[in-house]
């Protein structure tokens, strides 16, 4: 329980490990997480909510790893990202949107690497890049600036934007802009949602 009397979390333990449905609440009483566990590992559907009650993310887990479609939303309810995972690794179509709903990125991933067509857009809706990859190696590309004029290189398109998506130790997925990580995170997933919410409050 929180100091203000609100319930913090609730769930079952089996042999000292989380088992079955666990629920975590924000300190303001809003539900924060619903996650299913098996032998202490997430297994099944996990849903996260913002403090305002808006859904933050939803995805399936298998034996402690995200598996299947993972979807994230902005706090205003607009869809932020949708990605396909296989045994904890990105695999398949990955899509991102700006907060106003304009599409930002659409790319395909195979075995953790870009494979096939990859397209990005500026916030004004104009296309920013069209690239074709084969297992992480870029084979063809076209770039434009935010006015729709052709750009000779990705760096010319307002300071550069590459599709190096990385997952750091904390499980945060970032798009990198030049040499520094992009300031807005795509979405996050955690090996233990209960610990995540405990540290956030």
What name fits each language-model region?
Residues 1-201:
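Glycine/tyrosine- and acidic-biased, solvent-exposed loop/turn segments at the edges of beta-strands
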